[in-house]
Amino acid sequence: SSTKAGSDLLVRAWVRSFGVQATISNCSNNYGPRQHVEKFIPRQITNVLDGVRPKLYGAGLNVRDWIHVDDHNTGVWAIIDSGQIGETYLIGADGEVNNVTVIRDILEAMGKDPNAFDHVTDRAGHDLRYAIDSTRLRTELGWEPQYRDFRSGLQATIDWYKANEDWWRPMKAETEAKYAATQKVVQAPVEGDADADGESH
């Protein structure tokens, strides 16, 4: 967003003008324990735990580059410890997956029909793809993600939400009430819809 880009420029200006000792990191989409249930992955997991069909914006072909929060944290520490002052490092785990595939992976991991989800009206201006190239972080600072396979990180996340209902339960009803006011279940899009492998046709 423009505000995030603006903050990066401010940090660069402070480093150059006032000698502030700072680095900048930009990350891809996080997932993992303790993420608010309004977010895409925990919302779908907790819906399934509640016996509610997951909700997918539009055709679900929007791609996100997912990184487990533990890997994001170790990336940040690597930058703090060894990064060059004033430089920007991108933190990503090569986890590009489209949204419909994420939902199907969640359903399969939880022993459900991978097609047991609802399409809802798409978000306005829904970005098609986010991606991060973390080559610099890996080559210069020697960082590597622990969760190289998205599904293994996803399973660990599912296990956490199963075991910690007392953490997410108090915020679930209010979150779903807000979504219910804006989301409408629609038929699966015909043109550009996705098949079981997440491919468009």
List each model region and its residues:
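Flexible, glycine-rich beta-alpha linker
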Residues: 20-40
